[in-house]
Amino acid sequence: MKLTKNRKKLSTKFNRDESYTIEEAVKLVKSTKYTSFDESVDLAINLGVDPRHADQNIRLTTSLPHGTGKDVKVLVVTQGPKEKDAKDAGADYVGKEFLEKLKTGWDDVDKIVATPDMMPELGKLGKVLGPKGLMPNPKSGTVTTDISGSVRDLKSGKIELRVEKNGIVHVQCGKSSFD
């Protein structure tokens, strides 16, 4: 593969085979920036586990102190008085009328939050939402009766960590402009 001039310049600043501490890695990210936009900083950790074994499977959610730097679009599927709570908490889309849009392939959302009473209707969309990673899940806190708390958490930078099939965790943890 042919390297561009900027890539050649960057390849002299670090060694791909060397491991760096978090402090060193952050300094490298800031010193090797050459794009005109605010780059995302991704974290890839090789845990050396086999996710096919249930006892080695890791799946958790955590909140980042300063968010991810990304504006998360949240759809809340609920009905009744919970709709007002969701709108007040900052949800971008609210209501069960969006179920029809989801059936047609609409996916202009990053996360979907639902109340337990709406899960039977959302369950019918499992084949559409599952592969996109949008299906609400009680373990990740997206199936809940506390709609406002869940929406606020997602908007403020709650991320889901999950082991991939090779035993690696990939997650976006911020932007290169973060201090």
Model-inferred region functions:
Residues 1-15:
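Generic N-terminal amphipathic, Lys/Arg-enriched alpha-helix
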Residues 11-14, 18, 26-36, 51, ...:
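Structural signal for hydrophobic packing residues in well-ordered secondary-structure cores
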Residues 17, 75, 114:
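Glycine- and other small-residue-rich loops at beta-strand/loop junctions that grip anionic moieties
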Residues 23-82:
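Translation machinery proteins
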Residues 25, 86, 130:
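Residue-level signature of catalytic and energy-coupling elements of molecular machines
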Residues 52-54, 83-85, 103, 121-122:
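Short active-site-adjacent helix-start/loop capping segments
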Residues 66-103, 109:
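Glycine-rich active-site/cofactor-binding loop and its immediate structural neighborhood
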Residues 91-179:
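Long, charge-patterned amphipathic alpha-helical coiled-coil/hairpin "stalk" segments used as oligomerization
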